[in-house]
Amino acid sequence: VTRAASSAASVALFPARPEDALEAAFEICRRLRDFNDRREEAGEYPVRIGIGIHTGQIMLGTIGENQRMDTTVIGDTVNLSSRIEGLTKAFGVTVLVSEDTVDRMGTRDRFRHMGRVRVVGREEGVDVYEALDAPATSTLETDPKVRWVNREAFEMGVQQFAAGRMDDAYRVFKKLYHDEPTDRAVIAYLKRIIYYRKKGLPDPWDGIFRVASK
């Protein structure tokens, strides 16, 4: 862990393999599940977290003066990781991974493609993926088995959305919502599709899911 990115977030580096970052994220989920189980037994609400993982070049250095020195990292990779972490709230998932990271791992079998998303502060979109085998952090989360089963249909709905076929996308996500009404990613897409069906698509349409907040 190199530094706190904000009052509620930290930045960690994994120089060897992207799988190391993913396994660290899973271990955080497992530890949080133990903590949340105790909270639920005490009648308290579980704590939720979001983890964003991206792979790329960074600048690492030491700043400050003799009285206080601090090692920190800067660069677009760091910023995008933070933005991806912010997307976990919009989609209601725990671990989101960039396409660059998924490609480095060499397989997409364990991920659900969430679409091409434009985050605050960036002009271009970025493809992000949910880590489907991330351990549940509380009993209130959607059953991961359901997401595995519905992954193909979800990704088909994302493709229809990206192609601008909102009626087809609506039918796909409506059925997914019927099958699992607690999947917040499905709800997020349904809300956006309903809006576009009512207001019409922007011209030109770029197929990007836009998120208004960090």
What would you call each of these model-derived segments?
Residues I58-L60, T88-M166, K174-K175, E180-A185, ...:
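Cytosolic regulatory/linker segments at or just downstream of nucleotide-handling modules
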Residues A8, Y45-G61:
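A short glycine-enriched loop-to-beta-strand structural element that forms part of the catalytic core
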Residues V1-P15:
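Conserved helix-loop-beta segment at the catalytic/binding core of cyclic-nucleotide signaling proteins
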Residues A12-I51, D76-K89, R110:
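Alpha-helical scaffold within the catalytic cores of cyclic-nucleotide enzymes
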Residues P202-K214:
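Intrinsically disordered, low-complexity, charge-biased linker/tail regions
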Residues R17-D20, A24, M59, E65, ...:
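Helical mechanochemical/support elements of P-loop NTPase systems and associated helical scaffolds
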